[in-house]
Regions:
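Short acidic/polar alpha-helix capping motifs at helix-coil junctions
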Residues: 1, 12, 50-54
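STAS-typified acidic loop motif
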Residues: 3-32
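Short, flexible active-site-adjacent loop segments at beta-strand->alpha-helix junctions, enriched
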Residues: 20, 84, 106
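Amphipathic alpha-helical interaction surfaces in cytosolic regulatory modules
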Residues: 24-100
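Short acidic-hydrophobic, aromatic-tinged amphipathic segments that line or gate anion-handling sites
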Residues: 101-105
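Short, charged, intrinsically disordered terminal tails
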Residues: 107-111
């Protein structure tokens, strides 16, 4: 089970790119990486590029929800970009597709 997380900081937003699997074993690392992004200047908008995430269980969803709450408490926005069908299905089944802002293409979110 591998998880890769990278961040790119821009003037008004940060893009966090995640690839691999988010589960009980990798969720703590994701939580730490996202916490570091939120501490570093707290951008107005955080975009999480999910296009490389193959699997995400309830532990991973809880990490994403925690991040969403932190961003919203500070007046920011969090967007999930390009989740794969399996992850999108989990978001739909759990009703989280109505909680998160989900965009189909990472490029439309980042403006690139």
């Amino acid at each position: 089970m591998e998880l890769n997380v990278s961040s790119r900081f821009h003037d008004d937003h940060t893009i966090v790119t995640i690839s691999g699997e988010i589960d009980l074993y990798t969720a703590p690392r994701l939580h730490s990486e996202l916490a570091a992004v939120l501490v570093d200047g707290m951008p107005a908008r955080v975009v999480i590029d999910m296009s490389g995430v193959e699997f995400c269980d309830s532990t991973g969803m809880n990490v994403l929800l925690s991040c969403l709450r932190q961003v919203q408490e500070r007046g920011g926005e969090l967007e999930l970009a390009a989740p794969r069908p399996a992850v999108k299905k989990i978001l739909q089944v759990t009703g989280l597709d109505s909680v998160f802002t989900i965009v189909n293409e990472p490029t439309s979110v980042t403006g690139n």
